[in-house]
């Protein structure tokens, strides 16, 4: 018996790999997008700090710009440094 494939339609999904399911700043799901973006994906990436907390890039940048003196992680209050 031989089987011949006449048509194949591949389907894929993507998912960010993060410790939490939601951004600690905007509370939106990581597999969605932040309030500033319209579409999830590469235009709304996740960023990690050296403290291992993860946020939407736009959310943490707004948070850091609002800090007056030192920039701290909104979750653990350690000095914020982007993970390399």
Swiss-Prot record:
Q: Mind listing the GO biological process terms from this record?
A: anaphase-promoting complex-dependent catabolic process; cell division; positive regulation of mitotic metaphase/anaphase transition; protein branched polyubiquitination; protein K11-linked ubiquitination; protein K48-linked ubiquitination; protein ubiquitination; ubiquitin-dependent protein catabolic process
Which key words are in the record? Answer: Cell cycle, Cell division, Cytoplasm, Metal-binding, Mitosis, Nucleus, Ubl conjugation, Ubl conjugation pathway, Zinc, Zinc-finger
Post-translational modification remark? Auto-ubiquitinated.
Task: Say yes or no: keyword Nucleus present.
Answer: yes
Q: Which domain of life is it from?
A: Eukaryota
Q: Which SUPFAM superfamilies match?
A: RING/U-box
Cellular component GO terms, alphabetical: anaphase-promoting complex; cytoplasm; nucleus
Its primary localisation, in coarse terms, equals: cytoplasm
Q: Name one GO molecular function term.
A: cullin family protein binding
- Zinc finger residue extent: RING-type: 34-77
**Binding-site positions, Zn(2+) 2:** 51, 53, 73, 76
Output the PROSITE patterns linked to this UniProt entry. ZF_RING_2
Task: Extract the Pfam families matched here.
Answer: zf-ANAPC11
**Quaternary structure, from the entry:** The mammalian APC/C is composed at least of 14 distinct subunits ANAPC1, ANAPC2, CDC27/APC3, ANAPC4, ANAPC5, CDC16/APC6, ANAPC7, CDC23/APC8, ANAPC10, ANAPC11, CDC26/APC12, ANAPC13, ANAPC15 and ANAPC16 that assemble into a complex of at least 19 chains with a combined molecular mass of around 1.2 MDa; APC/C interacts with FZR1 and FBXO5. Interacts with the cullin domain of ANAPC2. Interacts with UBE2D2.
Q: What is this protein's function?
A: Together with the cullin protein ANAPC2, constitutes the catalytic component of the anaphase promoting complex/cyclosome (APC/C), a cell cycle-regulated E3 ubiquitin ligase that controls progression through mitosis and the G1 phase of the cell cycle. The APC/C complex acts by mediating ubiquitination and subsequent degradation of target proteins: it mainly mediates the formation of 'Lys-11'-linked polyubiquitin chains and, to a lower extent, the formation of 'Lys-48'- and 'Lys-63'-linked polyubiquitin chains.
User: Which family is this protein grouped under?
Assistant: Belongs to the RING-box family.
What's the entry's take on its domains? The RING-type zinc finger domain coordinates an additional third zinc ion.
Name the chain's protein.
Anaphase-promoting complex subunit 11
Q: Which gene is transcribed and translated to give this protein?
A: ANAPC11
